[in-house]
């Protein structure tokens, strides 16, 4: 359990310190940087598990800007922030060292402010919907029949969303073309 937490924590620290720091306007505040370094010193004793080529968040972040549009990027980042919050809450509850608990709370506070200021929205509501959908029992015959019964309506709704997105894209392209001619 502690080894898993250490791995998760390390990749989180990497995300906070190096991942975001690559953006010119992004940086880790000095007091947060110090807290992260102190937590790393406390939790990370052996780097072996950390460097096992299975990052927790970095693989998702790698393709974030390439594969997703801005609203999707913000939603995903909000979900990542929420995941960090849950990880650090668990670590704080499991810790017996008061100084470590305080450092974790300090990091949590910074993450909370970041999430509130830069990634507000309905991520909690969307996460609830996603969890509900992921919890569906695909092998349940009743669920299978209900899904089949609802498929045409769901398919129509998906098609409407796709068509709306295409119309908006064409509208933007037409506007850009018009602006270029002017």
Curated annotation (Swiss-Prot):
Principal place of residence: secreted
Originating species: Carassius auratus
Quaternary structure (record): Homodimer.
UniProt name for this protein: Interferon gamma 1
GO-annotated cellular components: extracellular space
Alphabetically ordered keywords of this record: Cytokine, Glycoprotein, Secreted, Signal
PANTHER family attached to this UniProt entry: INTERFERON GAMMA
Single GO term (MF): type II interferon receptor binding
Signal sequence range: 1-21
GO BP annotations listed: immune response
Cell compartment(s), UniProt: Secreted
UniProt tissue specificity: Highly expressed in spleen. Also detected at lower levels in brain, gill, kidney, heart, intestine and muscle. In immune cell populations, has highest expression in peripheral blood leukocytes and splenocytes. Detected in kidney-derived monocytes, neutrophils, macrophages and leukocytes.
Family, per entry: Belongs to the type II (or gamma) interferon family.
Domain of life: Eukaryota
């Amino acid at each position: 359990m502690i080894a898993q937490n250490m791995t998760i924590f390390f990749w989180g620290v990497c995300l906070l310190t190096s991942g975001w720091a690559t953006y010119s306007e992004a940086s880790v505040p000095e007091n947060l940087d110090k807290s992260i370094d102190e937590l790393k010193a406390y939790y990370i004793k052996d780097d072996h598990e950390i460097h096992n080529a299975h990052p927790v968040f970095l693989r998702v972040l790698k393709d974030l800007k390439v594969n997703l549009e801005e609203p999707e990027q913000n939603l995903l980042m909000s979900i990542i922030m929420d995941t960090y919050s849950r990880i650090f809450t668990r670590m704080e509850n499991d810790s017996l060292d008061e100084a470590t608990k305080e450092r974790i709370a300090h990091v949590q506070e910074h993450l909370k402010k970041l999430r509130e200021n830069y990634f507000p929205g309905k991520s909690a509501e969307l996460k609830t919907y996603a969890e509900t959908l992921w919890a569906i029992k695909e092998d349940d015959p009743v669920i299978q029949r209900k899904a089949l019964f609802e498929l045409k309506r769901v398919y129509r709704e998906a098609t409407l969303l796709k068509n709306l997105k295409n119309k908006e894209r064409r509208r933007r392209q037409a506007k850009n073309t018009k602006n270029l001619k002017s």
